[in-house]
Amino acid sequence: MEQLAHLYHEHISELNRRVADITSRENLSGLVIHSGQPHRQFLDDMDYPFKVNPHFKAWLPVIDNPNSWLVVNGHDKPTLIFYRPVDFWHKVADEPTDFWAEYVDIKYLTKADKVAEFLPADIDNWAYIGEHLDVADVLGFNRRNPDSVLSYLNYHRADKTAYELACMRKSNSIAVTGHQAAKTAFYNGASEFEILQVYLSAISQGENQVPYSSIVALNENAAILHYTALEQTSPPQRLSFLIDAGANFHGYASDITRSYAFEKNIFDDLITAMDSMQLQIIAMMKPGVSYVDLHVATHHKLAQILIDFDIATGDAAGLVEQGITSAFFPHGLGHMLGLQVHDMGGFLADEKGTHIASPAEHPFLRCTRTLAENQVLTIEPGVYIIDSLLAQLKQDNRQQQVNWNTVDILRPFGGIRIEDNVIVHCDRTENMTRNFGLNR
C-alpha cells in the first residue's frame, strides 16, 4: 500500500496538470465534479445500484458514496466534499483515512441539499462535471459538461498513470482468481448460476461491485454475445463453457474472457487455434499501430482458421471482403479499458474531440485510436455460430462458401471468445491477464 500511495501522489499531480491546462484554455476557474446521486426505482422506495461518475473516481477510489463532490482547479489541493449524513437506516461511509486522504482537503456534508455552502462563491466561472444537470441548474452552474473539457479529459484518460496501471494489474489478478475457480466449477458439473456464485465468491465481490454483468454461458448459450440469463440447472450434456467476467480494484476494471471444451474434440482444437491467433494479434501491438488495422488483421487470420477447420472455403482475403468472417465474428476486436469497461476516448483523434468513426464494414468496433504508450486495451477475438447472422449468408451466393455440415457440428457449442487485458509499452506489451497465470 505504501508503493500505491507513492504512485497516487504522482497520479494526482498529473490530473492537476491536466485540469490546469484545460481550464486555462477555457477560461475556467476550475471543475466541480459530482460523484452522482441515487436513482429511485419507479413507483418504489428503493434505489437502483449506485454507479459513480467515472470522472470522480479518476481522482480517488471512492466508488460507493453518492452526493459527494470534488472541487479542483489544477493548482490548489483538491477539495473533497464527502457526504456523511446522520442516517440510522443505512451504513454511513467512514471518515476517510486511507492512503489517498492526505492528498485532498476533506469537508463533511451532512445534508445533500446543503452542498452550495461548500462550493466556490464565483460558481459562474466553474464547470459542473456530472450526470445530474437538474442539480447543476439549481446550484447555478452555467457551464455544464462542456464538450471541450470532456473531450480533453476523455482523450487523455487513455494515457494511464503508473498508479492506474498498478490498480489494473490488481484488478486482473483478482479476476484471474475467479476465472480459475469458475473453470474448476464447470468441469465439476456446476450450472451457469452456480458457476457465477463460485466466481463472485472467489473474488469477494458482489454482482453490483464487479464492473459489468458477468457472462456465464454453457453450450449454445455461448453464441449469445451478451448472455446474462443464467440457467439454474445443468444441461443434460455438457459441451462448452464461455465466461466473460471482470473485477474491480479502486474503481479500475478488468475484463477477461475464456472458453473451454468439456472434452477433446474439434471445438477444443478450434479454441487452441483461436488462442494462438489472439496471441499473434497481441504481438503486433506497439505505439503507432492503428487499432483498426489490428481488427482487420484479426479478420484475415480468422478467415484462415475458418478454412483450416473446413468451416468455409475460398481464399482468406475473399472471405473478409465478402463479409463472411463478419458473420462468424460480428463484434470488434476490443476496446480501451480503465475506469470504465468501455473506457471513454476510444474514438478520439485528439484532445479537441475529433471523432474517428468505425469503418462502415466493421460498425461495432469500439476503438479506432492509434496505439500509444501506457494505453490499456482488450484483445478479444471470437468465433460463433449465430443463426441469425448465418441466415444472411444463405440469401446469396456466399452460402456456397460455407460448409454447413461443420456449422451443424459446431452449433451446440455456441462460440469462442478469448480476451486479455494488455498494456502498451514503448518497447513491448504487457499481458496482465496471462502474467497472472490465466493461459489456455
UniProtKB/Swiss-Prot annotation:
InterPro entries assigned: Creatin/AminoP/Spt16_N (IPR029149), Creatinase/aminopeptidase-like (IPR036005), PepQ_N (IPR048819), Pept_M24 (IPR000994), Peptidase_M24B_aminopep-P_CS (IPR001131), X-Pro_dipept-like (IPR052433), X_Pro_dipept (IPR022846)
Cofactor requirements of the protein: Mn(2+)
EC main group: hydrolase
Enzyme Commission number(s) of this protein: 3.4.13.9
Pfam families xrefs: PepQ_N, Peptidase_M24
Binding site for Mn(2+) 2: 244, 255, 419
Reaction it catalyzes: Xaa-L-Pro dipeptide + H2O = an L-alpha-amino acid + L-proline
A Gene Ontology BP annotation from the UniProt entry: proteolysis
Residues where Mn(2+) 1 binds: 255, 335, 380, 419
MF terms (GO), sorted A to Z: aminopeptidase activity; metal ion binding; metalloexopeptidase activity; phosphoric triester hydrolase activity; proline dipeptidase activity
GO cellular component terms listed in the entry, alphabetical order: cytosol
Keywords: Dipeptidase, Hydrolase, Manganese, Metal-binding, Metalloprotease, Protease
Cofactor note: Binds 2 manganese ions per subunit.
Biological function: Splits dipeptides with a prolyl residue in the C-terminal position.
Similarity comment: Belongs to the peptidase M24B family. Bacterial-type prolidase subfamily.
Protein name from the UniProt record: Xaa-Pro dipeptidase
Species assigned in the record: Shewanella piezotolerans (strain WP3 / JCM 13877)
